[in-house]
From Swiss-Prot:
The keyword Transmembrane helix does not apply. It comes from Bifidobacterium animalis subsp. lactis (strain AD011). CDD domains: HisA. Belongs to the HisA/HisF family. It catalyses: 1-(5-phospho-beta-D-ribosyl)-5-[(5-phospho-beta-D-ribosylamino)methylideneamino]imidazole-4-carboxamide = 5-[(5-phospho-1-deoxy-D-ribulos-1-ylimino)methylamino]-1-(5-phospho-beta-D-ribosyl)imidazole-4-carboxamide. It is found in: Cytoplasm. Pathway: Amino-acid biosynthesis; L-histidine biosynthesis; L-histidine from 5-phospho-alpha-D-ribose 1-diphosphate: step 4/9. This is 1-(5-phosphoribosyl)-5-[(5-phosphoribosylamino)methylideneamino] imidazole-4-carboxamide isomerase. GO terms for molecular function: 1-(5-phosphoribosyl)-5-[(5-phosphoribosylamino)methylideneamino]imidazole-4-carboxamide isomerase activity; phosphoribosylanthranilate isomerase activity. Its EC number is 5.3.1.16. Keywords: Amino-acid biosynthesis, Cytoplasm, Histidine biosynthesis, Isomerase. InterPro entries: Aldolase_TIM, His_biosynth, HisA/PriA_Actinobacteria, Isoase_HisA-like, Isoase_HisA-like_bact, RibuloseP-bd_barrel.
Length: 242
């Protein structure tokens, strides 16, 4: 069994950036988002995790730019879109742009009825991002708290959610290793698939996540580790597919 890897391209003010712990103002600029995405596709990526940080933080959006990335690369790679998807208009815009999957942030959990409806309507084209601090959800660009993790999961499981993207926000962009215990806790409580996000800093972290494959942790998002040169995507894919 192989682990699916999703290199991340986070977009703010039209540029590819990386944040530390999801904090606005902590970004490092990595240039053109299209060039970044193309780099990962050329290196063998089958998925890209494309994030509109301005939409997530409520400071505008990069919708046109994200649409252009999908237009140019969508025939070569599956694109998961994330950031600021919290109503029909933002969800429809992402799907109409050609996203293979759309990640609904915990901000959408402020409207659970809507979340349940779109899960029912779109099935596995919708994933729910669980951004976690301890066992509490962080919402709206990680600034606010959004409720208990496991209570929220019970509701989403009942609604038929097919995938969770689980991020320990204290580790994201910190190169401090993923929270394996959290990933295991989530995977053991649901039949949904789980994507690991945040903190991956070395190839051994991917090996540790791979051990959770039998529980349903089938994929991992790679961000700062790739941009900072901790390892190459080719090296990561070799581990993921071993």
């Amino acid at each position: 069994m192989s682990l699916t890897l999703l290199p991340a391209v986070d977009v703010r003010d039209g540029k590819a950036v990386r944040l530390r712990q999801g904090e606005s103002g902590s970004e490092t600029d990595y240039g053109s988002p299209l060039d970044a995405a193309r780099t990962w596709v050329d290196a063998g990526a089958q998925w890209i995790h494309l994030v509109d940080l301005d939409a997530a933080f409520g400071t505008g959006d990069n919708r046109a730019q994200l649409r252009e990335i999908v237009r140019q690369l969508g025939d070569k790679v599956n694109i998961e879109m994330s950031g600021g998807v919290r109503d029909d208009a933002s969800l429809d815009a992402a799907l109409d742009a050609g996203a293979a999957r759309v990640n609904i942030g915990t901000a959408a959990l402020e409207n659970p009825e809507w979340t349940a409806r779109v899960i029912d309507k779109y099935g596995d084209k919708v994933a729910v991002g669980l951004d976690v601090r301890g066992h509490t959800l962080a919402a709206r660009g990680w600034v606010k708290e959004g409720g208990g993790l496991f209570e929220t999961m019970r509701f989403l499981d009942d609604a038929g959610c097919s995938r969770y993207v689980v991020t320990d926000v204290t580790r994201d962009g910190m190169m401090s290793g993923p929270n394996i215990d959290l990933l295991r806790e989530v995977a053991e409580r649901t039949d949904a698939r789980v994507t690991a996000s945040g903190g991956i800093s070395k190839l051994d972290d991917l090996r540790a996540i791979k051990e959770l494959l039998p529980l349903g942790v089938d994929s991992a998002i790679l961000g700062k580790s790739l941009y900072a040169g901790a390892f190459t995507l080719e090296e990561a894919l070799a581990v993921a597919n071993a």
